[in-house]
Amino acid sequence: MVKEADFHGKAAHLAHREEDPCAILCTMTLDDLNVSGKTRYPVGISPIIDPVTGEVPIDSKGRRSYTTGMSYCPSLKKFVVMGYLPKEIAIQGKSLLIEYFNENGDGLYPMTVQIVGKGSLYDPNNERVRA
């Protein structure tokens, strides 16, 4: 929703909103934290890897896919990852990898795309809030 009042840059903003996004923020969950023989808890920004190609996916503007944040979610009992994916691979259920301290090939963590775009893993229908 864009406010009705005119503001500097409104025309450009409205034009940008009409464009099809080339990358989409997705919510993913890590499938395994023990890929190197010991449990690690990744944090920060890491490259996202397509397991089919072994490469970092790149969107139509040349931007590489990466995680924007990740943390353990006690309510879900899962490790949740946020990251931008090109729209071509932003598919719910898609398997991907993140590279985290990949020493000797022991730092590729499997993850699954859970939500493409807006959404919530915890209480997606806001039922708990309204109870």
Regions found by a protein language model. Name each.
Residues 1-131:
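Conserved, structured C-terminal
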